[in-house]
Design a protein with these regions (language model features):
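A short local loop/turn or secondary-structure capping micro-motif enriched for an aromatic residue
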Residues: 13-14, 67-69
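Short, electropositive alpha-helical surface patch
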Residues: 58-65
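Conserved catalytic core of Hanks-type protein kinase domains
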Residues: 51-52, 64
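Proline-centered flexible-loop/turn and helix-kink motifs
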Residues: 30, 66-67
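Conserved short beta-strand edge segments in small beta-sheet-based binding/regulatory domains
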Residues: 68-79
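Short active-site oxyanion
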Residues: 45-47, 70
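Short S/T/G/P-rich N-terminal loop/turn motif that feeds into the first structured element of a domain
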Residues: 1-35, 39-44, 53-56, 77-92
Length: 92
């Protein structure tokens, strides 16, 4: 399953976030694969696309950052995959 993860933080948290990320890395749990990461150039927000078959393990990993930022995880699907599924349903 794919998740789009949105991280938001207050300006005063930036330095601690950078320090922790440099020192400890991504803090990703076993069974979770990071497919991409992007940072908002305006600051205060970043995005990750991750894949995991175990939502509980994935979500427990996001808690490691909860003291510094808000973490939202949204289950997503590739649009082309969804369109193929919808097309098949329409015929049925």
């Amino acid at each position: 399953m794919l998740f789009m993860v949105i991280y938001t933080w207050e300006p005063g948290q930036r330095n601690e976030l950078v320090r922790r990320r440099i020192e400890k890395g991504k803090l990703i749990r076993e069974g979770v694969k990071v497919l991409g990461e992007w940072t908002d150039l305006g600051g205060g927000r970043a995005f990750s696309l991750v894949e995991s078959n175990d939502a509980k393990s994935f979500m427990s990993g996001t808690n490691r950052w909860g003291d510094l930022m808000k973490v939202e995880a949204v289950p997503v699907i590739d649009t082309e995959e969804l369109m193929k599924w919808a097309k098949g349903r329409k015929k049925a």
